């Protein structure tokens, strides 16, 4: 009876953290927000909110979810694993019982998988020439990133997390425009794309923004 609520609560902090990073991306890369607004206007219109029934028809929003998880993983060193037997990797001996951390941050920036400019927030990297969601690289099993982990200890709530991010992003962009704040002189307040605090998750530090009705 407790499994579902605990699973939901367990994923709330990471989803909240991801939404914070995504909103920062909307401030830093307004062209991606404009493209998402255009897709929502064309598919959903202004008479109703987006729903999960729109999921197949919103490839850019779905790509935006993948890119947010790729761009700023909330667990940049993944979940610890332990080797079950002695092993060798590239000349290095790994004894049985060794605690292993995966550098998800670095893996998500592999240019051979993700192309150039992996530091930039670019949902289009997940789209094909026709604008549909492209098939994923086999190494990441269509997830589009390494942020959900590997093997038997990958994220059990990854599908729920994807769905939560999709509907939150779609509804928020349908309803609002996310804009940078200005100081008293009319200049944009600076953005720190690398500002973060460690609270167990990789959480964005404070920043300022405006939400305007879309």
Identify the meaning behind each predicted range.
Residues 25-75, 84, 90, 95-98, ...:
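Cytochrome P450 I-helix active-site segment
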Residues 1-39, 68, 99-103, 153, ...:
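Central I-helix of cytochrome P450 enzymes
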């Amino acid at each position: 009876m407790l499994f579902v609520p605990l699973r939901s609560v367990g994923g709330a902090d990471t989803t909240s953290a991801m939404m914070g990073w995504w909103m920062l991306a909307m401030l830093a890369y307004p062209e991606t927000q404009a493209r998402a607004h255009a897709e929502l206007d064309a598919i959903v219109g202004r008479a109703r909110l987006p729903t999960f029934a729109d999921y197949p028809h919103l490839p850019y929003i779905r790509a935006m979810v993948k890119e947010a998880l790729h761009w700023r993983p909330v667990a940049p060193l993944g979940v610890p694993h332990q080797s079950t037997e002695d092993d060798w990797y590239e000349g290095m001996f790994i004894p049985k019982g060794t605690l292993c951390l995966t550098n998800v941050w670095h893996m998500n920036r592999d240019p051979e998988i993700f192309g150039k400019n992996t530091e930039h927030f670019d949902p289009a990297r997940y789209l094909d020439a026709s604008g549909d969601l492209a098939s994923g690289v086999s190494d990441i099993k269509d997830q589009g990133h390494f942020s959900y982990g590997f093997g038997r200890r990958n994220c059990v709530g990854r599908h729920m997390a994807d769905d939560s991010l999709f509907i939150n992003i779609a509804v928020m962009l349908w309803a609002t425009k996310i804009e940078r704040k200005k100081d008293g002189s009319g200049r944009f307040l600076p953005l720190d794309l690398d500002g973060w605090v460690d609270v167990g998750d990789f959480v964005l530090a404070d920043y300022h923004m405006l939400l305007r009705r879309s």
